[in-house]
Amino acid sequence: MNLTQDQAESLANATNALSNENAAMAKQVGEALKRYGALGQVAGLTAKQTAAMAATLIGAGAEAEVAATGMNAFMRTMTKGGSMTDLQKAAFGNLGFDAKQLQKEVQKDAPKAIFSVLEAIKNKLPKELQMQYLTAMFGEEGARAMGPMIANIEKLRENFALVADETKYAGSREKEFAARAKTTSNALT
């Protein structure tokens, strides 16, 4: 992901804070980042936004590998533009999106584009068509990971907000270490 030492430290603190706010361990989020992080940045997400997305997916029940593969399929499709298949273009078009415009929007503001697509699927389609559209748009791998995201849009929004404000997570690893060091079991060893 080509991060400086300070950026890596900040990402580690953000990942730790995300693990404290989600049913995802920092190790799992880190594994998803290792698999997908660099591609997320190419697709328009920051490393911390990618971590937030991974934490949301893992918290919704996805394994780290499934989360990484699903994010890859999801973001790769969103950045295809005119290279989308006819089926993908039709599915996005039915929801009011133009493939080339969406490609530009992802690069301009990836979280906004992600929310607009997820909310369109959730709000414009009956539940029985949502997985069908997710599969048509993002393939089996993308649909498998992103299906649970539809039900967790607000959690994703909270996670993006958390990583957007470094004051919310700065030093979180050190604080957690200090808290654990004060426990009775640690004091006895």
Show the residue positions of the predicted features.
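Alpha-helical architecture feature
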Residues: 1-21, 28-38, 46-189
